[in-house]
């Protein structure tokens, strides 16, 4: 059984009713051709602003995980309560893994402080494929396959965008996207639970915390 998931190190959204405005303000347009394959992770795509040196930062400010909603404000296969639970779990787990790696956690913007922002951008169901497909979203939008019927196993794709910012100026430093493959499948009529998402977050948080720690100054 397989479930394909896209999860990123970080992307921009600051929550609540301000989601729409914040997306257009924070996520400046960057063509997918500007992203390069990561040397350490072939499934990861990275955009880095020219001249940026992450070693000048030695603390991180972790924003809450947010969700880009559909026009009707509803998620496909995920309830609002589960969204809140997933958001809290993401924040606590990622912060814990960062601390394990020796990364200092800031509580406010400041010099040498990097802001990490993350948001889930889309859910999609597709028929299983033996090859991991390119899951990079072409735009910031929900993309749900609505014509799926029956109880055949389907792969779940969870899209996310990512960015690291200077905490004081808001300048974009790095944006990251990556495709991950888990070991489960789902069916269209089975709701995706917070517990299933937490297993994915555990793996992601540990690997991304180490990756970030390796690139920051100490």
Regions found by a protein language model. Name each.
Residues 96, 101-169:
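Surface-exposed short loop/turn segments
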Residues 14-16:
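C-terminal motif of bacterial Sec signal peptides marking the signal peptidase cleavage site
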Residues 54-57, 75-86, 90, 150-156, ...:
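Extracytoplasmic/periplasmic, Sec-exported soluble proteins
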Residues 39-50, 79-80, 98-104, 147:
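N-terminal post-signal-peptidase region of extra-cytosolic proteins
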Residues 83, 87, 91, 95, ...:
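Extracytoplasmic/secreted envelope proteins and their assembly/folding machinery
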Residues 18-49, 150-159, 163-218:
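C-terminal/domain-edge helix-coil "capping" segments
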Residues 55-117:
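N-terminal segment of the mature soluble domain
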Residues 4-12:
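Sec-dependent N-terminal signal peptides
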